[in-house]
């Protein structure tokens, strides 16, 4: 024991700066948290890989360092929203921090649900951590700033793109390559156009007819908003239809009034997407983002658009995935001109998803929660969190040796996100997000099950969206 203590002492002498910094850091958290010893803060989030890491790792570590207990509820996407919004509306203070998905933040800001983090820390310097620096975050942080003041309203905890995943083992198999060439006259490679993607999907659906293998995933639940999101945020942009087809100035949705929701491009996109169901596994019409990830991990699809938060575990975790070492990553296929528009900053090719933790005004433990949000916003906790959840919210994380090593195992997913993340975009800054979703989604569901044609679905959806926007006062 004495030898061990002496060794540690020598280490601290030789690395004095490091030791004093680490001890000072520990001391700061303990000192800052002293007034809140024994307090319990409660948070809620969707049960994602990144959230589970908070629940299982970061929450307990924070408690150990500060004495503040963290109760974290990781639940379903719909329950997360339902519980958090009802709590904030009723001002009951059940939750001290809530998950704010990128696409709902504008609604929360419009309804004044959230505490201004920048102002709160400026007003109480005793709980402002020197290790919490907003400038360390990627530009994804901008989605969680008040557009008027520029103040931070949420601390990013996950951010990822939705790339095109494909089975490298199938695409690289010489026998399959020959069969594809004989069948189609083309070389088998990741699709860059929608025509190529459909051709590959059809080929693998036929090839895998007796192998429990289909040609593509489709996030087409006929009763869940996941279908709305896949179409409007992942598929429609690849056809040049942005911001759900709603004009950001006039709030027109119909083509007749200057919108794009029922434009020729939008109709081509929906027909393409619905047509892919012919080559997708039977669970596709009941698949949300979770089931799509499960389908791909089970080896039931040759390709698909899969949320990046699942990329790491699908490619590396043998306890949950049957395709470890077999996953390729690429950009989604697009229509002519769309990639060029995205590179010029005039469009985008898919969804840049993610979220932050924010503090409701209804919270009864705001200061303790501010400490926790800063704790998860330290550079030092980012790398292992990224390994667990395929999420990166700070530029420095990309260069960490652990991430560089894992990047090789996930076919360059992190490199793709770093270099081409600018080609993706979050949801449009609409405070009426939920209302339009509710009136438009039913028409997408009807197209999925074949109750109405895709063209008719979008005509009716655009009309319904405009009517709702008139009702809400956005459009006259």
Where are these regions (language model features)?
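Hinge/lid segment of periplasmic solute-binding proteins
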Residues: 25-35, 102-163, 328-333, 340-343, ...
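Short, polar/charged alpha-helical segment
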Residues: 27-32, 49-69, 165, 169, ...
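Extracytoplasmic "Venus flytrap"
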Residues: 28-29, 35-57, 78, 160, ...
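Long, aromatic- and glycine/proline-rich binding clefts that accommodate carbohydrate-like moieties
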Residues: 29, 327-343, 387-446, 476
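Short, well-ordered beta-strand elements
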Residues: 37-48, 68-73, 96-97, 153
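Extracytoplasmic "Venus flytrap"/periplasmic binding protein-like
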Residues: 57-136, 174-175, 303, 319-322, ...
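Extracytoplasmic/periplasmic substrate-recognition and gating elements
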Residues: 150, 170, 277-281, 319-391, ...
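Glycine-centered hinge/linker elements that transmit conformational signals in sensory
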Residues: 196-205, 237-286, 328
């Amino acid at each position: 024991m004495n030898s061990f203590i002496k060794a540690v002492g020598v280490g601290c002498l030789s690395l004095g700066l490091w030791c004093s910094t680490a001890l000072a850091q520990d001391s700061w958290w303990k000192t800052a948290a002293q007034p809140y010893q024994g307090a319990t803060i409660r948070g809620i989030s969707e049960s994602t890989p990144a959230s589970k890491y908070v629940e299982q790792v970061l929450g307990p570590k924070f408690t150990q360092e500060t004495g503040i207990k963290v109760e974290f509820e990781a639940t379903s996407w719909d329950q997360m929203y339902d519980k958090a919004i009802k709590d904030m509306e009723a001002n009951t203070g059940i939750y001290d921090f809530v998950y704010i998905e990128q696409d709902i933040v504008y609604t929360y800001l419009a309804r004044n649900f959230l505490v201004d983090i920048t102002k709160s820390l400026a007003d109480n310097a005793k709980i402002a951590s020197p290790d919490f620096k907003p400038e360390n975050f990627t530009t994804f942080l901008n989605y969680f700033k008040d557009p008027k003041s520029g103040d931070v309203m949420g601390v990013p905890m996950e951010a990822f793109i939705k790339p095109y995943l494909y089975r490298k083992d199938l695409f690289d198999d010489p026998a399959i390559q020959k069969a594809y060439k004989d069948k189609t006259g083309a070389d088998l490679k990741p699709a860059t156009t929608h025509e190529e993607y459909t051709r590959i999907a059809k080929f693998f659906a036929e090839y895998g007819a007796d192998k429990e293998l289909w040609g593509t995933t489709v996030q087409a639940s006929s009763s869940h908003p996941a279908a709305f999101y896949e179409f409007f945020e992942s598929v429609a942009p690849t056809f040049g239809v942005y911001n759900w087809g709603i004009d950001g100035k006039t709030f027109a949705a119909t083509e007749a009034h200057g919108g794009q929701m029922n434009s020729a491009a939008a109709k081509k996109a929906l027909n393409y997407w619905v047509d892919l169901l012919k080559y997708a596994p039977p669970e596709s019409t009941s698949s949300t983002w979770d089931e799509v990830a499960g389908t791909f991990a089970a080896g039931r699809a040759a390709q698909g658009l899969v949320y990046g938060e699942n990329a790491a575990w699908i490619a590396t975790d043998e306890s949950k995935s049957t395709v470890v070492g077999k996953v390729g990553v690429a950009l989604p296929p697009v229509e002519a001109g769309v990639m060029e528009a995205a590179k010029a900053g005039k469009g985008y090719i898919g969804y840049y998803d993610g979220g932050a933790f924010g503090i409701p005004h209804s919270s009864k433990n705001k200061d303790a929660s501010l400490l926790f949000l800063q704790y998860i916003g330290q550079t030092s906790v980012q790398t292992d969190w990224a390994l667990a959840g395929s999420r990166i919210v700070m530029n420095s994380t990309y260069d960490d040796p652990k991430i560089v090593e894992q990047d090789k195992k996930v076919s360059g997913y992190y490199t793709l996100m770093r270099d081409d993340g600018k080609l993706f975009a979050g949801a449009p800054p609409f405070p009426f997000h939920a209302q339009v979703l509710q009136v438009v989604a039913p028409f997408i569901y009807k197209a999925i099950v074949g109750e109405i044609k895709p063209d008719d679905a979008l005509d009716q959806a655009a009309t319904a969206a405009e009517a709702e926007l008139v009702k809400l006062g956005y459009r006259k």
